[in-house]
């Protein structure tokens, strides 16, 4: 009788015992009168030794990635044959029976991490690509993390509740994926961009702690690393302050990193306001793994004769600087030109510089800084071989963002970023609204259900551009990992927010009438957060793309080479749905 085991279960106690393993063939080595097979299952790899003549005939027919059953005796390898690179490298199975469960066609690419297959080929044969250890392990880590999340939240008395997948179309920024109704011709469901409204309804229903590993859908233009469908941890709590949510998430992530990566995170994450993040790092999702920071030099240049600075300050704008210590000799004219191109992309007045040589400014705009030279050198403790970059704009936010991007570029070029660090950061007190210069209207900075801070509520309509919300983001290594807020739980206040963004009563009733009605029935104060599972696992596994941590992702054009979706449907189906297809050239 053979004991059925997995590859990782080979151990000393099974020496000279009969074992049976079902696995895939990873490697074949022919040595004349015997053959070695390296086999692999989900758990580990193992070596099989084939010496018997009748089994050699079967083994001769076996090719890579055949699915086989091996029965044999487990034996200890000779000391000089032990493979230290395999966890089971001290053992091998002496084959007594071999069964080919299933053959494998010629492979479209080698099942190795360093194969040169195209992305489309890997996605088309995703089931083969998933056999690679590196990819498989990322998916397994994802499973472990979501399992820990569930267990952690259930122990905290959260209820895992499912919200609808077919919902009313209430666009939240991106376009909705819509689904035609066969029964109600001309009407459409939408796939949810997030469970936002439903989780708030759950709070109104009296379920004070909710979570869901939610599938979300956004019909966005093809762009970089976006996926049309993604997964987020969605949670909401009643009678809560943002500090309660911070603590909950910090404890949860501490558990995940300890169990999945054996990394001990700090019990509390750093916290900074949106304004500080922009002023100091030039980003609302700053990478804090390195110390290069922005400074505002506007006051020190108030009497500057340099026209760009003069005009900026005349328009009550902002001048930002970035000082790079003892690295001036690394910045050639070509490198500085590259940085100037970044500044242009962000529509600043330009990027300017000056190096410190012989305790004086040199190069760049040095000749325009003669008056302020010694004052600036003293104020900012500038030394020889330092370089100082300047950018200016009448808009504070534009100057910050441009210099923030230059900061990241310089850090990458100089190797300042520690790729092994995990730096979490809470950014809070975001603006409630953004002003659109083209349409001359206000739009929600995050979403329209976030509560303004108390001191701004009375004057909302007068100063929407200065209103701060109870909004917070969780950032990891310069990536926005999660976003949340304390929500509005008052119908009148919610309608005031709608009015500011141009959703007058009729429009808001049409789109959100069901939700506004619910706010009339004793809504509790509540708040929550949504954390991107795909992004979290991507960062934990140091992957370069979220495609690496999604089981069956789409490509960059939102199509699936695996099943050729999206695809056309038959005329009969279209007729049944009451849909006519209009082509672009019609």
Curated annotation (Swiss-Prot):
Job of this protein: Aspartyl-tRNA synthetase with relaxed tRNA specificity since it is able to aspartylate not only its cognate tRNA(Asp) but also tRNA(Asn). Reaction proceeds in two steps: L-aspartate is first activated by ATP to form Asp-AMP and then transferred to the acceptor end of tRNA(Asp/Asn).
Binding site residues for L-aspartate: 172, 218, 446, 487
PROSITE patterns noted in UniProt: AA_TRNA_LIGASE_II
Residue sites binding ATP per the record: 218-220, 227, 480, 532-535
Record keyword Nucleotide-binding present: yes
Keywords: Aminoacyl-tRNA synthetase, ATP-binding, Cytoplasm, Ligase, Nucleotide-binding, Protein biosynthesis
Main location group: cytoplasm
Residues marked Important for tRNA non-discrimination (site): 31
Enzyme Commission number(s): 6.1.1.23
Gene3D superfamilies in alphabetical order: Bira Bifunctional Protein, Domain 2 (3.30.930.10), GAD-like domain (3.30.1360.30), Nucleic acid-binding proteins (2.40.50.140)
The organism of origin for this protein: Borrelia garinii subsp. bavariensis (strain ATCC BAA-2496 / DSM 23469 / PBi) (Borreliella bavariensis)
GO terms, molecular function: aspartate-tRNA ligase activity; aspartate-tRNA(Asn) ligase activity; ATP binding; nucleic acid binding
Domain of life: Bacteria
Family: Belongs to the class-II aminoacyl-tRNA synthetase family. Type 1 subfamily.
PANTHER family: ASPARTATE--TRNA LIGASE, MITOCHONDRIAL (PTHR22594:SF5), ASPARTYL/LYSYL-TRNA SYNTHETASE (PTHR22594)
Gene Ontology biological-process annotations: aspartyl-tRNA aminoacylation
Enzyme type, top EC level: ligase
Region of interest (Aspartate), residue spans: 196-199
Phylogenetic classification of the source organism: Bacteria, Pseudomonadati, Spirochaetota, Spirochaetia, Spirochaetales
Subcellular location: Cytoplasm
One Gene Ontology cellular component: cytoplasm
Protein name as annotated: Aspartate--tRNA(Asp/Asn) ligase
Description of how the protein assembles with itself and partners: Homodimer.
Catalytically driven reaction(s): tRNA(Asx) + L-aspartate + ATP = L-aspartyl-tRNA(Asx) + AMP + diphosphate
């Amino acid at each position: 009788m053979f004991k059925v085991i997995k590859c990782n279960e080979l151990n000393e106690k099974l020496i000279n015992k009969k074992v049976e393993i079902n696995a895939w063939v990873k490697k074949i080595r022919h040595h004349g009168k015997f053959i070695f097979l390296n086999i692999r299952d989900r758990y580990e790899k193992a070596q099989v030794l084939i010496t018997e003549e009748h089994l050699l005939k079967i083994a001769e027919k076996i090719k890579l990635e055949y699915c086989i059953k091996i029965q044999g005796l487990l034996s200890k390898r000779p000391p000089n044959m032990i493979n230290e690179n395999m966890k089971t490298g001290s053992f091998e199975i002496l084959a007594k029976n071999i069964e080919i469960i299933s053959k494998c066609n010629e492979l479209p690419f080698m099942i190795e991490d360093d194969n040169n297959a195209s992305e489309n080929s890997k996605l088309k044969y995703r089931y083969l690509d998933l056999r690679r250890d590196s990819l498989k392990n990322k998916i397994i880590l994802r499973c472990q993390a979501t399992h820990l999340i569930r267990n952690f939240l259930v122990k905290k008395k959260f209820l895992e509740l499912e919200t609808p997948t077919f919902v009313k179309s209430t666009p939240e920024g991106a376009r909705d994926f819509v689904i035609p109704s066969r029964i109600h011709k001309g009407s459409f469901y939408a796939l949810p961009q997030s469970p936002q409204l439903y989780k708030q309804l759950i709070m109104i229903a009296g379920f004070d702690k909710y979570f869901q590993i939610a599938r979300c859908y956004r019909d966005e233009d093809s762009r970089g690393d976006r996926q049309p469908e993604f997964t987020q941890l969605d949670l909401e709590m009643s009678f809560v302050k943002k500090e309660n949510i911070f603590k909950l998430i910090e404890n949860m992530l501490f558990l995940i990193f300890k169990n999945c990566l054996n990394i001990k995170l700090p019990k509390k994450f750093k916290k900074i306001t949106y304004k500080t993040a922009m002023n100091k790092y030039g980003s609302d999702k700053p990478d804090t793994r390195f110390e290069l920071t922005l400074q505002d030099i506007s006051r020190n240049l108030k009497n500057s004769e340099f026209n760009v600075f003069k005009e900026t300050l005349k328009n009550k704008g902002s001048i930002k600087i970035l000082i790079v210590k003892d690295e001036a000799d690394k910045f050639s004219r070509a490198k500085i030109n590259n940085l100037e191109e970044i500044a242009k992309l962000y529509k600043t007045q330009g990027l300017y510089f000056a190096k410190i040589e012989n305790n004086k400014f040199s190069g760049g705009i040095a000749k325009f800084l003669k008056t302020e030279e010694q004052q600036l050198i003293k104020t900012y403790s500038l030394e020889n071989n330092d370089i100082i970059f300047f950018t200016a704009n009448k808009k504070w936010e534009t100057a910050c963002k441009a210099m923030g991007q230059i900061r990241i570029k310089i850090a990458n070029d100089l190797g300042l970023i520690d790729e092994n660090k995990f730096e979490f950061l809470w950014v809070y007190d975001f603006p409630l609204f953004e002003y659109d210069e083209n349409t001359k209207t206000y739009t929600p900075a995050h979403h329209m259900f976030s509560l303004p801070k108390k001191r701004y509520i009375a004057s909302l309509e007068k100063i929407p551009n200065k209103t701060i919300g109870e909004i917070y983001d969780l950032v990891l290594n310069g990536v926005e990992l999660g976003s949340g807020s304390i929500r509005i739980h008052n119908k009148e206040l919610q309608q005031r927010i709608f009015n500011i963004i141009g959703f007058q009563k009729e429009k808001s009733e049409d789109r959100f009438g069901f939700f506004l009605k619910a706010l009339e029935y004793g809504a509790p104060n509540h708040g929550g957060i949504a954390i991107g599972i795909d992004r979290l696992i991507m960062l934990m596994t140091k992957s370069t793309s979220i495609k690496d941590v999604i089981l069956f992702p789409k490509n960059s054009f939102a199509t699936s080479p695996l099943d050729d979706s999206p695809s056309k449907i038959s005329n009969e189906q279209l007729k049944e749905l009451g849909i006519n297809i209009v082509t672009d050239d019609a």
